């Protein structure tokens, strides 16, 4: 009888990739639904489009590589990548933004390295950075959240903006003759305001910060936090990376705020703005691209938190998680090499 030897690591576990990925997607659902509530149909369209293109791209590449298509597609890893890209891009971004990003993530970042388990960078974050650098206008034009906007684009209007290239302002002008469709994210608004000489208190008095965090963003982060806590409860992820990210970011932001409260955001604004909770629980915890040991995960997460604070405070990209995660991915092998668990039976040399 012939036995087929699978590639390492040879781990015994009852958990299957398909089930794990599906549970992660379910845990991300509260945050995704919160985004749909605040940013409208566009977010749902982007998610559906990104997942469909991700699965189709994965199937096409597997076919070209003469690899089994059905089994790999059913592991839900491509669908999860599509979901993460779908919630990361602006709700009314053109359809080709999602298409280019997803194809890049699956084809270049994942499959060219050998597929799931072999990629060295997080596919969704690598795609996000590529899109942000290549198409800054489309990637930084966010629809105003519900409560700050003077509009309520329906499903057909959102489809028109995304697929036919109609301008959201033109759609509203046609419907009601009003403006106010797009606006900066809270982090972008703070960065722009500080660059013009405003103090943080002056920036936070604007209508878009009526709840102190930016309309909608705090609740979106709370929804992702709730999903992340469920993942911890189900033991889908380890606690070290997420905890280290949030603790590191909180400490760095607290120090900066204490030293200069007029020019540095407070720790709570850092924690509940942008993609903080999404990245801390659903992106940085990717077991393929993160450090593996217990101490290594703590260092890995702390590095991400530090990088996020530095990039948000002193660089040109306010929501810095994509860059921070990719830089930490580069450091993960180095961290694993120097932070090794002691081998069983090891004796210190005399």
From Swiss-Prot:
<comment type="similarity">
    <text>Belongs to the NqrB/RnfD family.</text>
</comment>
<comment type="subunit">
    <text>The complex is composed of six subunits: RnfA, RnfB, RnfC, RnfD, RnfE and RnfG.</text>
</comment>
<keyword id="KW-0249">Electron transport</keyword>
<dbReference type="InterPro" id="IPR011303">
    <property type="entry name" value="RnfD_bac"/>
</dbReference>
<keyword id="KW-1133">Transmembrane helix</keyword>
<keyword id="KW-0812">Transmembrane</keyword>
<keyword id="KW-0597">Phosphoprotein</keyword>
<keyword id="KW-1278">Translocase</keyword>
<feature type="transmembrane region" description="Helical">
    <location>
        <begin position="265"/>
        <end position="285"/>
    </location>
</feature>
<feature type="transmembrane region" description="Helical">
    <location>
        <begin position="239"/>
        <end position="259"/>
    </location>
</feature>
<dbReference type="GO" id="GO:0005886">
    <property type="term" value="C:plasma membrane"/>
</dbReference>
<feature type="transmembrane region" description="Helical">
    <location>
        <begin position="212"/>
        <end position="232"/>
    </location>
</feature>
<comment type="function">
    <text>Part of a membrane-bound complex that couples electron transfer with translocation of ions across the membrane.</text>
</comment>
<feature type="modified residue" description="FMN phosphoryl threonine">
    <location>
        <position position="185"/>
    </location>
</feature>
<feature type="transmembrane region" description="Helical">
    <location>
        <begin position="36"/>
        <end position="56"/>
    </location>
</feature>
<keyword id="KW-1003">Cell membrane</keyword>
<feature type="transmembrane region" description="Helical">
    <location>
        <begin position="89"/>
        <end position="109"/>
    </location>
</feature>
<keyword id="KW-0288">FMN</keyword>
<keyword id="KW-0472">Membrane</keyword>
<keyword id="KW-0813">Transport</keyword>
<dbReference type="InterPro" id="IPR004338">
    <property type="entry name" value="NqrB/RnfD"/>
</dbReference>
<dbReference type="GO" id="GO:0022900">
    <property type="term" value="P:electron transport chain"/>
</dbReference>
<keyword id="KW-0997">Cell inner membrane</keyword>
<feature type="transmembrane region" description="Helical">
    <location>
        <begin position="298"/>
        <end position="318"/>
    </location>
</feature>
<keyword id="KW-0285">Flavoprotein</keyword>
<feature type="transmembrane region" description="Helical">
    <location>
        <begin position="124"/>
        <end position="144"/>
    </location>
</feature>
<feature type="transmembrane region" description="Helical">
    <location>
        <begin position="319"/>
        <end position="339"/>
    </location>
</feature>
<dbReference type="Pfam" id="PF03116">
    <property type="entry name" value="NQR2_RnfD_RnfE"/>
</dbReference>
<protein>
    <recommendedName>
        <fullName>Ion-translocating oxidoreductase complex subunit D</fullName>
        <ecNumber>7.-.-.-</ecNumber>
    </recommendedName>
</protein>
<dbReference type="GO" id="GO:0055085">
    <property type="term" value="P:transmembrane transport"/>
</dbReference>
């Amino acid at each position: 009888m012939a036995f087929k030897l699978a590639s390492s690591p040879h781990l015994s576990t009852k958990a299957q990739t398909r089930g794990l990925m599906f549970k992660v997607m379910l845990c991300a659902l509260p945050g995704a639904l919160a985004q749909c509530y605040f940013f409208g149909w566009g977010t749902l369209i982007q998610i559906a489009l990104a997942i469909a293109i991700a699965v189709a791209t994965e199937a096409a590449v597997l076919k070209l590589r003469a690899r089994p298509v059905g089994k790999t597609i059913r592991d839900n890893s491509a669908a999860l990548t599509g979901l993460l890209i779908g919630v990361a891009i602006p709700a009314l971004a053109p359809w080709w933004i999602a298409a280019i990003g997803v194809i890049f993530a699956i084809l270049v970042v994942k499959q060219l390295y050998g597929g799931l388990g072999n990629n060295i960078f997080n596919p969704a974050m690598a795609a996000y950075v590529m899109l942000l650098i290549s198409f800054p206008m489309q990637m930084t034009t966010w629809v105003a959240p519900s409560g700050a906007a003077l509009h309520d684009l329906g499903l057909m209007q959102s489809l028109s903006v995304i697929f036919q290239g109609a301008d959201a302002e033109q759609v509203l002008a046609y419907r009601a003759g009003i403006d106010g469709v797009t606006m900066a994210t809270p982090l972008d608004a703070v960065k722009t305001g500080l660059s013009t000489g405003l103090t943080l208190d002056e920036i936070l008095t604007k209508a878009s910060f009526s709840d102190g965090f930016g309309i909608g963003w705090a609740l979106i982060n709370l929804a992702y936090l709730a999903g992340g806590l469920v993942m911890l409860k189900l033991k889908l992820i380890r606690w070290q990376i997420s905890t280290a990210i949030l603790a590191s970011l909180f400490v760095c932001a607290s120090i900066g705020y204490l030293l200069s409260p007029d020019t540095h955001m407070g720790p709570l604004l850092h924690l509940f703005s942008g993609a903080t909770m999404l990245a801390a629980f659903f992106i940085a915890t990717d077991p393929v691209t993160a450090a593996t040991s217990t101490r290594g995960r703590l260092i890995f997460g702390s590095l991400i938190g530090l990088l996020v604070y530095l990039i948000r405070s002193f660089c040109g990209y306010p929501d810095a998680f994509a860059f921070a995660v990719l830089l930490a991915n580069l450091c993960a092998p180095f961290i694993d090499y120097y932070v090794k668990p002691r081998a069983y039976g090891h004796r210190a040399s005399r």
